[in-house]
Amino acid sequence: MLAKIALSAATFAIDRPYSYRVPAQLENLLEPGMRVLVPFGKGNRSSEGLVLSLEQAEETHRLKEIQTLLDRRPVLTPEGIQLALWMRERFFCTVYAAALTMLPTGLWYVLKEGYALAPGVDRETWEAKTAGHPRARQVMTLLHGAGGRADLAQIRAIPDGKDPRGVLRELEKAGLVVRETQARRKVKDKTEQIASLAVDPAEALARMEPRRKTAPMGYEVTSLLCNLGSASVKELCYFTGASHQTVKSLEKRGILRLQEREVFRHQLPDIQQTQPLSPLNEAQQAAYEGLRALMNGGKPEAALLYGVTGSGKTQVYLHLIEQTLAAGRGAIVMVPEIALTPSLLQLFLTHFGRQVAVLHSCLSTGERYDEWKRVRDGQASVVIGTRSAVFAPLADVGLMILDEEQESSYQSESMVRYHAREVAKFRCTHHKGLLLLGSATPAVESRYAAEMGQYHLFTLRQRYNAHQMPKVRLVDMKQELRQGNATGLSGLLREELEENLRRGEQSILFLNRRGNSRMVVCSQCGEVPTCPRCSVHLTYHSANGRLMCHYCGHSQPLPELCPHCYGRLQFVGMGTQKLQEALEESYPGVEIMRMDADTITATQSHEVLLDRFRWKQVPILLGTQKIGRAHV
């Protein structure tokens, strides 16, 4: 048997399925979608690979053999393999890179190369064979002293400054050492020990009764298990005060048995009872009926839901998802910003409970891996997340929604430069599902596709419950400057803020530029400090007194004078930090909360800030696009 494998070591130019011989012990274990370690290239260095297909073949003796099986079950379905092959052609990446993009980082492997003494090689043998070769003897001495094996990094640390690979190749040819590669996964499955009675409850208590006084903790544990049936060892020790040794002794006596149970790291709020959906108005109902007909048509469809802000597109989404779940299928909802996820998640949990999973980059590696497993194992049928949620391993996708589909954040800028909309089209085609693009300001290409009939167009022209659109007033800041107001706060804005404060109402200020000043410029020569890596203008941050690049993260101290002509530096433009300072000066004693990339750092801290704004009634919230789309 041979396997067609996509390799991580292959560049795009040589990326193709490579054939490898399947060893006899793996023939009944290996499946497409599993990862393996294989030798690759002239040096036969170990490389990760993804099994694309298996074939029966007799003439396989000339093929290299698979070294190790890394997965116990496939990490990609047949659909996932097809998607990886399609992404290679569409986004010019390798198949393995596409596969890694689909998987949570907790499933990625880290390979560590090392060398060990060959079997049967003793000290006398290698000393004789390395006589006259001091460098080789150094390596062998290190291996011998390390217990017979050392990582390549340890061997490189030998203090002579030379690359040891040449010597290692010679030692390998001489049969003195063998190369080994260890694969370690970034995150392991989290488990806990569960205790349950191994005998009838009456028998267990009868056996512990004679030891009730001499072993009271053992009796307490047994009594508790008689009432509960089973419990984690951690809970047993907590509620009874027993030690782990007590539980172990009960296991040895055959009174209870211990088993490992998988637990999930990310615990969503437990919704005891879900709420029914709100009724739709006439326009929403018309859009819903049309979209439902497309979804139930049995063929892939794409639609654009073009609705003004506040028209109730989310309610249409919820009713469509309810219909999808009723048909036994799954739904994926993508939002452009992580800040949108908490409020949307709470709304979905209220209606769909534990069927909901969340996938975004603010989860820890372990939490994201566990949520991915819940989706893969069918424990969740509704996935909410940012761009990467498009790869959620739902078995049957009936509906995929891209909210605010025009946003640039759906385009990846990392290793595989995919667009979530393109991937969603592929998946909906495969599953014969509905792709729904929602927006108040659709992308030009999406609106054009709708007008040309490539997408079905549905429109919501009125706000929900006939609410009026807010009035917009434009203020000429140049005129404000002529009148002597250089603060960045217009007279009208000050009046409205003061009126809101007087009424005890909250205000939200949106400024899509973080930092203190947009840029720093020399008043004499006009020189502007730029990033040495990206050549973009650096932004001044007053919190740390440094110039920072918002593209790559480069940071440097603010010079006192222009480095070119020693002229005086001027600060041009206003960022959120400077606006916060102006507000604090204008309204002393008033709490002003800032929400931008500089204040959102810890896991889910955007949720903490939004909750604090909601429940503690912070008077003024200032921020960038982090609040521009948040449900505050």
Regions found by a protein language model. Name each.
Residues 274-275, 303-309, 472-487, 595:
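Glycine-rich phosphate-binding "P-loop"
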Residues 332, 352-363, 532-533, 539, ...:
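Conserved RecA-like helicase motor-core motifs
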Residues 1-439, 446, 451-467:
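Accessory, non-ATPase domains that flank or precede helicase/AAA+ motor cores in DNA-metabolism machines
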Residues 502-585:
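Cys/His-rich short segments
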Residues 427, 436, 445-449, 454-523:
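Conserved interdomain linker/interface between the two RecA-like ATPase lobes of SF2 helicase motors
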Residues 364-375, 600-623:
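Conserved helicase ATPase core of P-loop NTP-dependent helicases/translocases
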Residues 627-632:
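Conserved small/polar residues in nucleotide/adenosyl-binding loops
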